[in-house]
């Protein structure tokens, strides 16, 4: 493994870790970064899923005590059972639609115009949602993640389905959707983190089974480097985001999305971006 390949794996891991939990679309960033780094071989998709796994491990580590408490409390504690049920309910819609339309989504939406459009539209939705939040006089209805109802979870799960469109952002869809449905900003952010766990674990398992040939002796080292880079950067990002949402809104991410969407459109049609 040469040092250039090592640098590419580390850069992509950091990009994934920094963008997976921000409402900016990690998919769009990985496509652009992978193209500029000329990292678009046959197993690039598997590498992307592996580094996503590294990012979700960071969430598991950050919330390890709560996760252990939920798992051990499942047989007897109603709060643990209710929380688990909410995560399951919120996860089902995206998994069902993803399995049904995976091939069509890849065939139709993985090109510069749809991704750029999703980035810009997602940014506009965030601006609109934040304007609504500022106009509200009453506090958010759901002030604690334990106060979520199954109906709240279903609504957030339906919002997560928009993330099947490349460029829309899973975290953006769930956080902004949650806020629009009455969740406090921090509650929506934390619930989005927990929803990522089954989604990304499932995607990792699915891609591993589908492309097991990619896991060779030569590639394992590269995958491990990317995973570690994603873990570290995601851990830093998650902690930073939790502090950020306590005192800021998501307007800055909205304008960034719009600018990045226009950039994707520019590089896509200029020939600078090898869209794979």
UniProtKB/Swiss-Prot annotation:
Assigned EC number: 3.6.1.27
- Which biological process terms from the Gene Ontology are attached to this UniProt entry? cell wall organization; peptidoglycan biosynthetic process; regulation of cell shape; response to antibiotic
Organism phylogeny: Bacteria, Pseudomonadati, Pseudomonadota, Betaproteobacteria, Burkholderiales
Per the record, membrane topology reads:
Multi-pass membrane protein
What are the record keywords, sorted? Antibiotic resistance, Cell inner membrane, Cell membrane, Cell shape, Cell wall biogenesis/degradation, Hydrolase, Membrane, Peptidoglycan synthesis, Transmembrane, Transmembrane helix
State the top-level EC class: hydrolase
Question: Which organism encodes this protein?
Answer: Burkholderia ambifaria (strain ATCC BAA-244 / DSM 16087 / CCUG 44356 / LMG 19182 / AMMD) (Burkholderia cepacia (strain AMMD))
UniProt name for this protein: Undecaprenyl-diphosphatase 1
The free-text function statement in the UniProt record for this protein reads: Catalyzes the dephosphorylation of undecaprenyl diphosphate (UPP). Confers resistance to bacitracin.
UniProt-annotated location(s):
Cell inner membrane
Residues spanning the membrane: 4-24, 45-62, 83-103, 108-128, 187-207, 217-237, 252-272
This enzyme catalyses:
di-trans,octa-cis-undecaprenyl diphosphate + H2O = di-trans,octa-cis-undecaprenyl phosphate + phosphate + H(+)
